[in-house]
């Protein structure tokens, strides 16, 4: 049983036990185009769509301002119709702080990668969270510097092969990965901290809810909110495009455990999230064994 939520693969060898539900396709109006310039199999467009859907669902489109980091996702500016400011590498949280303090009613968020946030700008996001700034930071974490061709970042997991860790990340030589969500959750100024993924449809749906809740936290002025989104990067991982989701689940997903790390004042440990994910995966597998999924 996979420890990743919705990890088990649906049984396609037998007829389904219940009829399929037709879901009306929905394309966020914020999306300016159906095209982007990212690699095939990249997970970042799904993360961008989750942000767009959350903003539209909450009616925050007109107040949204994005402080954009440096990375592959910088194409966000050409594909989503929101006001934005392009920031120096790692400095988006500080720029977002300035925007929020000058325009308190704006829905201010950052969009950054793991190289931008955790390597180049770790002090920026930690101090912003510690101050309890009423803004939202969104991290798209694929465990590599995608723009440079797949070099190790601070979030790369042990054993992960990158351009500069050909034999795999070694703790003795390269140090341990930084679990940024767990770090931020322990800061008093952080009100909501979650980690999602886009490696399957269920994960995308849960991640969109996390982004929505983060924006709601900001609108209530409860403090800093943070959502980490694990994304695929088959190009930077040097694997076939179709293997991206499974690779994410078996590498990043087994270390950067998904779930709500801090909500309603309660901090949840990695061990607690892992146990909950195992339980949910077992329940799902049991439902599949009984002949179908329950609502």
Regions found by a protein language model. Name each.
Residues 2-24, 33, 219-223, 228-295:
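Flexible, low-complexity linker and terminal segments
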Residues 68-146, 209-213:
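Thiamine diphosphate
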Residues 26-29, 153-220:
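Conserved thiamine diphosphate
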Residues 70-72, 142-144, 200, 229-236:
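Glycine-rich beta-alpha junction loops
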Residues 82-85, 128, 153-157, 243-246:
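Short, hinge-like loop/turn segments at secondary-structure boundaries
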Residues 19-22, 28-88:
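Active-site diphosphate/adenylate-binding microenvironment
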Residues 122-127, 147-161:
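Active-site-proximal loop->helix
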């Amino acid at each position: 049983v996979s420890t990743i939520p919705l990890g088990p693969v649906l049984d396609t060898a037998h007829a389904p036990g219940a009829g399929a539900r037709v879901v009306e396709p929905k394309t966020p109006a914020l999306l300016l185009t159906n095209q982007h310039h990212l690699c095939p199999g990249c997970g970042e467009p799904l993360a961008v769509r989750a942000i767009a859907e959350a903003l539209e669902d909450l009616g925050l489109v007109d107040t949204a301002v994005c402080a954009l980091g440096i990375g592959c996702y910088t194409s966000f500016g050409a594909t989503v119709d929101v006001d934005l400011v392009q920031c120096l590498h790692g400095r988006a949280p500080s720029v977002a702080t300035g925007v929020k303090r000058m325009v308190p009613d704006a829905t201010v968020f950052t969009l950054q990668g793991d190289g931008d946030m955790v390597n180049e700008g770790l002090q920026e996001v930690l101090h912003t969270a510690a101050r309890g700034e009423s803004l939202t930071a969104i991290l798209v974490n694929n465990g590599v510097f995608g723009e440079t061709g797949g070099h190790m970042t601070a979030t790369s997991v042990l054993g992960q092969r990158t351009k500069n860790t050909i034999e795999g990340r070694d703790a003795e030589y390269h140090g341990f990965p930084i679990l940024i969500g767990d770090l931020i959750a322990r800061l008093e100024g952080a009100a909501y901290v979650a980690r999602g993924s886009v490696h399957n449809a269920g994960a995308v749906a849960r991640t969109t809810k996390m982004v929505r809740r983060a924006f709601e936290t900001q609108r209530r002025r409860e403090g800093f909110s943070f959502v980490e989104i694990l994304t695929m990067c088959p190009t930077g991982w040097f694997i076939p495009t179709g293997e991206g989701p499974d690779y994410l689940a078996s590498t990043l997903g087994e270390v950067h455990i998904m779930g709500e790390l801090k909500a309603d004042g309660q901090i949840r440990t990695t061990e607690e999230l892992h146990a909950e994910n195992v339980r949910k995966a077992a329940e799902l597998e049991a439902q599949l064994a009984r002949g179908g999924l329950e609502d």
